[in-house]
Structures are given as C-alpha cells and as structure tokens.
Amino acid sequence: MAQQTPLYEQHTLCGARMVDFHGWMMPLHYGSQLDEHHAVRTDAGMFDVSHMTIVDLHGSRTREFLRYLLANDVAKLTKTGKALYSGMLNASGGVIDDLIVYYFTEDFFRLVVNSATREKDLSWITQHAEPYAIDITVRDDLSLIAVQGPNAQEKAATLFTDQQRHAVEGMKPFFGVQAGDLFIATTGYTGEAGYEIAMPNEKAADFWRALVEAGVKPCGLGARDTLRLEAGMNLYGQEMDEGISPLAANMGWTIAWEPADRDFIGREALEMQREKGHEQLVGLVMTEKGVLRNELPVRFTDAQGNQQEGIITSGTFSPTLGYSIALARVPAGIGETAIVQIRNREMPVKVTKPVFVRNGKAVA
C-alpha cells in the first residue's frame, strides 16, 4: 500500500491526478502539466516534497564523519545554515544517492535525501556512522513544501511572521534557517529562485491552503520533471545510480579532491577513473519535430573516425523553449552534433552543455 504525505487530502481537493511514485501517492498534475510548468517559470508554483527524507545528525564527530561519507567536503561549511550538494558514493565510486547537507553547529548537521533511496541511504549512513557515535534522527514529523519561481519568495513571505521574514531577508542561495516552527531554505529543483520549507506535519495543510490563497499554483511530478530537466538537474536512477560514477553524471564539480589526504568512500575508484577516462553527460537539443525520449541511442563519430554510441538518460519536450531537449551519457570525444535514432528515423541533434534554462532564460 502506497504511503500518503500529510498533504494528500489537499491534493485531492485541488483536483490532482495521483500516482504511485516510489511507494508514495503523489500528484502527477492538477489538470495541466504545461500550465504548472509555465507558472514556475513566470510566477510561482509549489510542490509537495514531503516524501523526501530529512535526517538530522548529532554528535561531536559529525563533521569528521561526513567528510568520510560524502564526496564533497563539509569542511567548506563554516557559516551557520550553509548547504552543500554532494554524492554519497559506494567503494567503486557509484552513486548511492545525491543529497543536500546543511550545517548548523559542530554537532548538528542535516541531510535531505531522495525518497526512492530512503531505506538503502539510512542503512548505509547508519552502518558508517557507528564508529563516530553519531545520533541519527529521521524527521518523519516534518513535511516539506517547495515554492519555486520568480515571485515565489515574495508570495511565500506573506505567510511568514515578522521574525521569519527578518530571518530570510537577504539570504543567499543554498542556505537554510530555522525560524519559529519553519525551516526555510533557499534551495530547489527547478532552476528558479524559491524556498524549500519544512514544517511540522500538522501545520502543512493550513500552510498549503494559505499558499494557494496567496496565488501560488500547485504543481505535480510532471512539471517537476520538465523543470528540472530544463535546468540540467539530475534525477537519481536516470542520470546516476550505484553503477554510474559522478564523473559520468556531470557531478565532477561536487567531488572535493583537495585536500589530497582526505579519505572519502569511493575516492580510490574515482582517481582511477579520472586517470583512465570516463563517459560524460551532455545536453542534446533537437529543433526538428519529434521528442527525444529516455533510452534512445545517441551516435557520433569521434575525432579518430570511430563510431561511438551513448544513451539518452532523460528527454522531453521543453515547454519553455518550444523544442525537444535531453541529457545523454556518451563516451568522451563527442563533437558539436550527433544522431539520435527515433523509431526508423535518424535525427540530427546539437550537443550542448547539460543545462538549458536558468531563471526563465534559455542558456542552450
């Protein structure tokens, strides 16, 4: 039986089409995925992301533990509330999950991990935390609402107390602050400004309704996927998994190689991959009619004249741009163009950086 978030009833009242998403009943859309997508790019939309798992870590050796557990280095986190994106890797350098970590005090850090990987994440974290005497608290008492778009922060702030408004004033991206009963973070999964707001479960329904009244549009998983793909943001299980290295998933920037003496899980395997060469994640753009879909083959001829083949990891029609875009994992050496096989047709595509839209504007 699929689980329900504390906002399930609100979704049905808003006319959502509900689907089972990794064991959670979640809204796919509320009538028009397209309208929801455009609302986030031009105004303000909101997503129930309460299916994601918030994990609080307490203990005097928490920073030391996370420096070993994660490929990125929490030594960078020195300001209270600062957040960092990282892969959590296995010994062979594959991605167990991608997550966000927040620093509050030397003995208190917070992780936000994906719903699809919850059980294996918690098992992995618990197993490796043991020698560090870390107290692990899964915050199932909290709901999480993402409010995203150019007007999202302004509209969300109408629900805040004076203290909360003051706490978030001038807050830069990738920070979080506990203000009253809300944890407000300047993070998101859309390529737009906004907040991800955690609150006690019993407050979530009222908060959702108040956001609707403030003119924030409820958005489902469909729009969430087209928005994150336009923004070039990875989806676990598609761009990366336990068999795929962060180096092959455009996550190289999340690996902190320095200091060279920091030992983290997967480091040795990544160093070997870096030496030998690895696949890469690129963007594809197709302005001709048709849609680039997941798992379609991507073919190109490298500089040595050899035929090479990769695969589309995520593809869709981009509502913002008006043509098809995709992320693809390909062998190194791809040029500016490639061919994608769509049914019996060979379609030319332009190869770009793996990001297409930022703050409502085309970058591809």
UniProtKB/Swiss-Prot annotation:
Q: Which UniProt keywords apply?
A: Aminotransferase, Transferase
Gene Ontology biological-process annotations? glycine decarboxylation via glycine cleavage system
SUPFAM superfamilies, per the entry = Aminomethyltransferase beta-barrel domain, Folate-binding domain
Asked if the record carries the keyword Metal-binding, the reply is no
Q: What is its EC number?
A: 2.1.2.10
Q: Which Pfam families match?
A: GCV_T (PF01571), GCV_T_C (PF08669)
Catalyzed chemical reaction(s): N(6)-[(R)-S(8)-aminomethyldihydrolipoyl]-L-lysyl-[protein] + (6S)-5,6,7,8-tetrahydrofolate = N(6)-[(R)-dihydrolipoyl]-L-lysyl-[protein] + (6R)-5,10-methylene-5,6,7,8-tetrahydrofolate + NH4(+)
Question: What is known about what this protein does?
Answer: The glycine cleavage system catalyzes the degradation of glycine.
The record's note on quaternary structure and interaction partners says: The glycine cleavage system is composed of four proteins: P, T, L and H.
Q: What is the protein named?
A: Aminomethyltransferase
Instruction: Name its species.
Output: Salmonella typhimurium (strain LT2 / SGSC1412 / ATCC 700720)
Chain's gene name: gcvT
